[in-house]
Amino acid sequence: MDTNLNFSPSQSNDLSTSSGYENVLSHFKQAALSVTQLYQASTTEVLKAQKAGYNQALREVLELIESGASIDFISQYCLEKLASSDNDSSVHNHHDNSVLRNEDTQLQPHIVCNRTVRAGRPVLDEDDEEMNIATPHKRRVYDLNSSWMKRGRR
């Protein structure tokens, strides 16, 4: 009976192994291509988002300059934005790796900068006396909520 079939079990294993290997290899290549395309698409989107954010920041600073804001105020505004951005990106709950929002932690970034550049010149020691004015100077400022308000100068 075995002589009539001319089919051995070893030939069957070789065929299924080679076709299985080719099938796995084909699926692996498809998965690798999908991952590569996903990476390229996400990189493109990240670059677009960074460029849009940079352009938005330039528009905000330009708006402040056009509104007549002082160099001190623009510097303070930029520092507050940077501090807010740093807090948003680095505040994590280490137990479950979830991001906490500023509202959750009630962080209000406020940076006091004692050494700034005024009118394009470095701050000198005698300028420290100007910082201790009894009556604060009122000025309009652009707060982090994108609105104008009056605030006393420190």
From Swiss-Prot:
Source organism superkingdom: Eukaryota
Protein name: Uncharacterized protein C6B12.14c
One cellular-component annotation, GO: nucleus
